[in-house]
Amino acid sequence: MLLDTYLTNEESASARVFRVYRETPAHYHVGSDEYLYVLSGRGTFWMGDSSNGAEFAAGDLLFFKRRVVHALPQIIEGPVVFLAIDTPRRDPKDIVFVNPEEGTPESFIRDRQLY
């Protein structure tokens, strides 16, 4: 992730724009629901289990309820740019990886930087 710009950051909800350049491993959020509106790009996602996958593209809305495991295993056409709305506002450290070897909140952000 290179760009992560907050448009609004209220306690009840936050809205931000961010870009994804690489796959995102299976994870979930404990404290908030996540809505991702696809502004550009194309990829695949799954939620619940990895056999339940689908493709997404610009104009699609993805919704991940809190504590539901989800992933973006493939970026087909990138970068993918999302408008993300988290309800309530999500703490940036609220990301739990199913496989702890795939990262921490800090390493996830750091390792996805382009530079």
Question: What do these predicted ranges mean?
Answer:
Residues D4, V17, F45-M47, L72, ...:
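Short hydrophobic/aromatic-rich beta-strand segments that constitute the beta-sheet cores
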Residues T8-E11, P73-Y115:
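Double-stranded beta-helix
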Residues A15-R19, Y35, G53, L61-F63, ...:
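Conserved hydrophobic/aromatic beta-strand scaffold that supports enzyme active sites
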Residues R22, G31, N52, V68-V69, ...:
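A generic "binding-loop/recognition-motif" signal
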